[in-house]
């Protein structure tokens, strides 16, 4: 798996990018982002600045031919708006890009994830497609973080404190089988949790009920596990790609 992974679909092939801004992370040009590491707003701003520079050098493809037409960004000023699809209020919900003189639907879908604790960082995921075509969600966890280990470490009965609320009976059974096969139980739970978070981020809703009700096998969503080739050592994550256009529409 690479930082820009082509995912084959029946309609088109969205290419995803995951950029990380965190202390001690060194990524190749075009495959990551560097910048301030202490404050999540600063990290997010650094990632947006990198994305603005990337989009500023691209040209919007003409859909009928696929040949580049007008620039994706004709002027600087890339920003973010959030509106909750459930309550209709601003300030939360899935982030969407804005830019001067550009229809939001022509900009790429994005998603952010933040890691706190002693190794803080921010992750930006974005797609090489229009926002009207796909939604993306990303989530990451640091399995070395005390908070994560406290939540996901099984007790003497084999269950972690969060299991009953976070995972369905079938998922808990799968975790037990994985532990019996030698999988690290904290990492396995963190990966599954990230998949659920990524799904609800791609939906733009957050958790509307217990996380155990979120089915990671949803048929219209593609889940991509994120590992050490993309993330800092000790982090795990997941990317969710949700198509927004009906089959047959280009």
Where do the protein language model's features map onto the residues?
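Core catalytic alpha/beta fold that binds nucleotide/phospho-ligands
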Residues: 1-250
